[in-house]
């Protein structure tokens, strides 16, 4: 009898720590299904909590958004950890209300490390300090970002030389990684307002700083980029690096109140 009770206790405890999404098993053919704010919270917890063996729980896992989420999401995915899986937005939109004015690396996704985020839109508002992006604050180490659209207002409270604020992406930084390859960003657009009194602001990407360079193509800004500072402000990429591979940037649509380079 005691053995049976022990068995059921172990089974219950294991079930308690398992991920509880709207469906799926996390494989490519059967991704975890994200349908509501509770699912986003579950993904946030999964991203910030290491597995039993100390590994990143989202590594090799697949997630798919099944519908628009109109209830504002106030949290972040990857606040303490980083996202290393594949997030397929399915062409849907997530409404955000992220207000973290004293925190760095703020966005729907904080850090995406060797992961992928694609086919997703966000709306609402995002407020942070340094490295603030509507969708991803900091993609790094071969992160793959494509088919992304930001409609949210993105604001940085920082006045630093590297506020790194972008409608879609805050700052691409991996200098400490040395030999790691840069991020790939393609088919991304911003329609939201981007503002800060600091430097390195862009409608799509605030700062692109990676020793090995990033690949950026087919990006456009249709929003307003505003700063009282006149340095490193641009419609699309606030601070591109010399070794970035940049192709097909739409600059004609940009509205600025400051000087810009790209």
Place the predicted regions along the sequence by residue.
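Bacterial Sec-dependent N-terminal signal peptides
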Residues: 1-19, 140
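Low-complexity, intrinsically disordered/propeptide-like segments
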Residues: 8-10, 14-15, 46, 68, ...
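Surface-exposed repetitive/solenoidal architectures
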Residues: 19-255
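Positively charged, low-complexity/disordered segments
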Residues: 256-262
